[in-house]
């Protein structure tokens, strides 16, 4: 299945996120338009340690930005991706790809994930709105926790400031939290970021609220 090209907001969001990703880091990101933008727009070589791998990794490799062999649980893309991956030891079981101890060791691990809802303290909901289910929890909490444990790593929640005219910031999540606030280091939008590291609850509220104003 062909990947959907990023829109300008995804490119801007990717550029804002990539400021925090050091050369040689291990990057985890989702399979959507933001993930595609991240892999296409990085200007420093990176390692990929993620759950689902798409065609964007082929583009990354062609431009000399891929270090070592990527690790993933699934492939999802076109024949170009499958041909590129054929014979390579890329795919692993979830017991390997989502292992927090492994992810938190070695090179800095930077997890970049999205959110449907974020509350003023940084709790994240990725599964739906109210009774409407959008998707499963996937590896969201695993990767965020591993990035927090990683020396030099970062857990980043990256979201457009508005989606379909609505802010992802809500007073209260409409579903249970998918990822707890303490596993979120940074919230990044296309126009800025909130650095929550070391912030107490009142500071978190102020930083997050200001970001989405």
Where are these regions (language model features)?
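Conserved phosphate- and dinucleotide-binding cores of soluble alpha/beta proteins
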Residues: 1-213
């Amino acid at each position: 299945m062909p990947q959907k090209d990023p829109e300008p907001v995804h490119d801007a969001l990717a550029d804002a996120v990539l400021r925090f990703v050091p050369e040689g880091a291990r990057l985890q990101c989702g399979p959507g338009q933001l993930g595609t933008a991240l892999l296409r727009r990085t200007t420093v070589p990176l390692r990929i340690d993620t759950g689902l791998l798409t065609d964007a990794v082929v583009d990354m490799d062609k431009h000399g930005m891929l270090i070592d062999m990527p690790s993933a649980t699934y492939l999802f893309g076109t024949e170009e991706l499958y041909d590129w991956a054929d014979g390579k030891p890329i795919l692993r079981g979830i017991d390997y790809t989502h292992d927090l101890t492994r992810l938190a060791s070695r090179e800095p691990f930077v997890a970049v994930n999205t959110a449907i809802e974020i509350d003023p303290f940084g709790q994240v909901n990725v599964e739906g709105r109210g009774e409407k289910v959008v998707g499963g929890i996937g590896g969201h909490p695993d990767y965020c926790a591993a990035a927090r444990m990683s020396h030099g790593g970062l857990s980043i929640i990256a979201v457009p400031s508005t989606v379909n005219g609505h802010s992802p910031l809500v007073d209260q999540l409409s579903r249970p939290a998918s990822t707890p606030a303490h596993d979120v280091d940074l919230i990044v939008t296309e126009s800025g970021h909130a650095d929550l590291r070391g912030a107490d609850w009142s500071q978190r509220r102020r930083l997050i609220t200001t970001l989405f104003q």
